[in-house]
Swiss-Prot record:
Catalytic activity of the protein: 7-carboxy-7-deazaguanine + NH4(+) + ATP = 7-cyano-7-deazaguanine + ADP + phosphate + H2O + H(+)
GO MF annotation list: ATP binding; ligase activity, forming carbon-nitrogen bonds; zinc ion binding
Binding-site residues, Zn(2+): 186, 195, 198, 201
Name of the molecule in the record: 7-cyano-7-deazaguanine synthase
UniProt cross-references to InterPro entries, sorted A to Z: QueC (IPR018317), Rossmann-like_a/b/a_fold (IPR014729)
Originating species: Edwardsiella ictaluri (strain 93-146)
Required cofactor names: Zn(2+)
Record-stated family: Belongs to the QueC family.
Function noted in UniProt: Catalyzes the ATP-dependent conversion of 7-carboxy-7-deazaguanine (CDG) to 7-cyano-7-deazaguanine (preQ(0)).
Tree of life domain: Bacteria
Cofactor comment: Binds 1 zinc ion per subunit.
Pathway the protein acts in: Purine metabolism; 7-cyano-7-deazaguanine biosynthesis
Length: 229
């Protein structure tokens, strides 16, 4: 049986990854992390979506220690969330978040004998986070396999897709409306199209506009990149 673990926040990217994983794997587990994020409503959204989409299990882990160590606008209410993309590393970056999340997801994958950990990080159309880069994911994957003496593959299906192509991927599986209306990507914790002001909402909305303006061309680009038929 092919089994995978999806790092699942209930946002656009991880939900799209879960939808695709359910088509590629026989058994899909989700793992969600509660680190005291200001947009904690995403945890309830993740629980609901994991059940609706048919994940076989969903584990929510308390990693509040990350909140104590990592100072960010996503972990501190007194630090304002930026309304547009910043040069350099933005204040929404949570240091060590993906180091911790991917490592814990790999431990869970080890226990349930999953062959892959799937994460929705992306280098093409991203927010400037260093732990979303392909180089980082590959390096950590290598270290985890050495440390566990087991081959657990880190999969990043969105790594080289832009936001418009990520919308196309959801549409390819017939789930565009669900991803648009039922996920939570907004840094201010507003479901669906979000607050419309934060950097995450701007990126998401711009990608959707690009896709809806020319769906055939974007879908064709997605298929070329991903090998979908």
């Amino acid at each position: 049986m092919k089994r995978a673990v999806v790092v699942f926040s209930g946002g656009q990217d991880s939900t799209t990854c879960l939808i695709q994983a359910l088509h590629h794997y026989d058994d899909v587990h989700c793992i969600t992390f509660d680190y005291g994020q200001r947009h904690r409503a995403e945890i309830d959204v993740a629980r609901r979506l994991a059940g609706q989409l048919g994940a076989s299990a969903h584990k929510v882990l308390d990693v509040g220690l990350l909140n104590e160590l990592a100072i960010s606008s996503l972990t501190r209410d007194n630090i304002p969330v930026p309304t547009q993309s910043e040069d350099g590393i933005p204040n929404t970056f949570v240091p060590g978040r993906n180091v911790l999340f991917l490592t814990l997801a790999a431990i869970y994958a080890y226990q349930v004998e999953a062959e892959a950990v799937i994460t929705g990080v992306c280098e093409t159309d991203f927010s400037g986070y260093p732990d979303c880069r392909d180089q980082f994911v590959q390096a950590l994957n290598h270290a985890v396999c050495l440390g566990m003496a087991r081959d657990i593959r880190f999969e990043t299906p969105l790594m080289w897709l832009n936001k418009a192509e990520t919308w196309a991927l959801a549409d390819y599986y017939g789930q565009l409306a669900r991803v648009r209306h039922d996920t939570l990507t907004c840094y201010n914790g507003v479901q669906g199209d979000g607050c419309g002001h934060c950097a995450a909402c701007h990126l998401r909305a711009h990608g959707l506009q690009q896709y809806l303006a020319n769906p055939a061309a974007v879908m064709a680009a997605l298929k070329r990149k991903s090998g979908l038929q």
